[in-house]
């Protein structure tokens, strides 16, 4: 199997994915946005608590 065949299969696979893909509707987009913001806030809060604990433990 040559490089041309590999490239052709790759293009066919991506074309199949793009034909099955669809744009999210407004409700789905809103839900994904809320979940992403919640995840960012959760990770940021955990990072802040770890940093705060580090400051408290090393300062005294």
From Swiss-Prot:
Belongs to the SecE/SEC61-gamma family. Keywords: Cell membrane, Membrane, Protein transport, Translocation, Transmembrane, Transmembrane helix, Transport. Essential subunit of the Sec protein translocation channel SecYEG. Clamps together the 2 halves of SecY. May contact the channel plug during translocation. This is Protein translocase subunit SecE. Its main location: membrane. The keyword Repeat does not apply. It comes from the Archaea. The keyword Metal-binding does not apply. It is found in: Cell membrane. Component of the Sec protein translocase complex. Heterotrimer consisting of SecY (alpha), SecG (beta) and SecE (gamma) subunits. The heterotrimers can form oligomers, although 1 heterotrimer is thought to be able to translocate proteins. Interacts with the ribosome. May interact with SecDF, and other proteins may be involved. InterPro entries: Prot_translocase_SecE_dom_sf, Translocase_Sec61-g, Translocase_SecE/Sec61-g. The chain crosses the membrane at residues 37-57. One of its GO terms (molecular function) is protein transmembrane transporter activity. GO terms for biological process: intracellular protein transmembrane transport; protein secretion; protein targeting. It is a single-pass membrane protein. Signal peptide: none annotated. One of its GO terms (cellular component) is plasma membrane.
């Amino acid at each position: 199997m040559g490089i041309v065949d590999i490239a052709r299969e790759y293009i066919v696979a991506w074309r199949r994915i793009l034909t099955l893909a669809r744009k999210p509707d407004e409700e789905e987009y809103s839900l994904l946005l809320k979940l992403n913001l919640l995840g960012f806030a959760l990770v940021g809060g955990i990072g802040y608590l770890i940093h705060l604990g580090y400051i408290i433990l090393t300062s005294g």
